[in-house]
Amino acid sequence: MKLPIYLDYAATCPVDERVVKKMMEFLSIDGNFGNPASRSHKFGWQAEEAVDVARNHIADLIGADSREIVFTSGATEADNLALKGVMRFYQTKGKHLITCKTEHKAILDTCRQLEREGFEVTYLDPKSDGLIDLEELKSVIRDDTVLVSIMHANNEIGVVQDIAKIGEICRERKVLFHTDATQSVGKLPINLSELKVDLLSMSSHKLYGPKGIGALYVCRKPRVRLEAIIHGGGHERGMRSGTLPVHQIVGMGEAYRIAKEEMATEMPRLTALRDRLYNGLKDIEETYVNGSMEQRLGNNLNISFNYVEGESLMMALRDIAVSSGSACTSASLEPSYVLRALGLNDELAHSSIRFTVGRYTTAEEIDYAIGLVKSAVEKLRDLSPLWDMFKEGIDLNSIEWTHH
């Protein structure tokens, strides 16, 4: 067993060796290095064919038509293209968008930008288990609502929203529905030929592919129109200009092909490892799982250890790679906005750790992590006057702290 142990697969994944091997074929002079937009020679044709094959693999995993896949630089760009592209194109129809307070920053920051442009955004509060209230969603849809954007699985707490039902609600009210499926693609079955989803964002590096490439699914029937946010050459049917990075696209395609093949066996294995971790930690006093345990990704566990400061716990756990808050924003010392939205107080939100297991995680690593977390929590609580007060039965919420 090698230290440190990587338990942060929701932040990124190593690239699968099979993917690396495939990508290497599309880089050097001996390989297939052509530009897929070069229509006049074999180098271009071979590159174009490789892109088509990858596009098909990606479409197959999510039950889409390959013509509905638009390549982007990642899920952040896909989210930007979906929200800005739709809202700007349909602004004569309406200027109202609905999302949720626990969305990824790629959605929330894009919504803030749209608000600066004069659009109106409604932010739904999640319930305490992280799920949105579908009745509340119905009640906030207006005549001028153009788009609803609700993520499939949350990046911090792994909670899975019912996108089938949300899609039905949106289709009934003639509102477009976008979902950010970055965390769920390849982990949960998604069949877009059955789901009423108009736009879906996905990433490659959360599924053992390379960083710097992602895609946006744009439904053809009923047709969804977008205003491009990047211009120059009209690639990707005018929706996203720029020379296609063939090696990255091939890598993403191969990663998605492998995921489709292995999902049925891999997800039960990951869920068993996650449950093993949970069972090893749940008996520690004053620990709370954040988010629904039923409607949840099989590889995610987000736990708050009360009376332990999250940052010091992370330092004590330097032999395991975990995160507090989400990867993009965990450099800030603000408590996680996702956990705050669930109604957790600052202390509990600050003491949360996200564990996410993946393809290379072993049972031995999980057992090591359990031992490490238990001793770290015990040690830090021994140093904590708050823990002593709690053990003495003092209600910490009733204490008036003075600020000097």
From Swiss-Prot:
GO annotation, biological process: [2Fe-2S] cluster assembly
Active site, UniProt feature: 328
Modified residue annotations for N6-(pyridoxal phosphate)lysine: 206
Gene3D superfamilies hit by this protein: Aspartate Aminotransferase, domain 1 (3.90.1150.10), Type I PLP-dependent aspartate aminotransferase-like (Major domain) (3.40.640.10)
GO cellular component terms attached to this protein's record: L-cysteine desulfurase complex
SUPFAM superfamilies linked to this entry: PLP-dependent transferases
Catalytic activity from the UniProt record: (sulfur carrier)-H + L-cysteine = (sulfur carrier)-SH + L-alanine
Cofactor: pyridoxal 5'-phosphate
Keyword Iron-sulfur tagged: yes
Record Pfam families: Aminotran_5
Residues given in the record as pyridoxal 5'-phosphate binding sites: 75-76, 155, 183, 203-205, 243
The organism's place on the tree of life at top rank: Bacteria
Main enzyme class: transferase
Keyword vocabulary terms for this entry: 2Fe-2S, Cytoplasm, Iron, Iron-sulfur, Metal-binding, Pyridoxal phosphate, Transferase
A GO term, aspect molecular function: metal ion binding
Subcellular location: Cytoplasm
InterPro entries: Aminotrans_V_dom, Aminotrans_V_PyrdxlP_BS, Cys_deSase_IscS, Cysteine_dSase, PyrdxlP-dep_Trfase, PyrdxlP-dep_Trfase_major, PyrdxlP-dep_Trfase_small
Pathway: Cofactor biosynthesis; iron-sulfur cluster biosynthesis
Transmembrane residue ranges: none
Protein function: Master enzyme that delivers sulfur to a number of partners involved in Fe-S cluster assembly, tRNA modification or cofactor biosynthesis. Catalyzes the removal of elemental sulfur atoms from cysteine to produce alanine. Functions as a sulfur delivery protein for Fe-S cluster synthesis onto IscU, an Fe-S scaffold assembly protein, as well as other S acceptor proteins.
Protein family (similarity comment): Belongs to the class-V pyridoxal-phosphate-dependent aminotransferase family. NifS/IscS subfamily.
Name of the molecule in the record: Cysteine desulfurase IscS
Source organism of this protein record: Histophilus somni (strain 129Pt) (Haemophilus somnus)
Gene that produces this protein: iscS
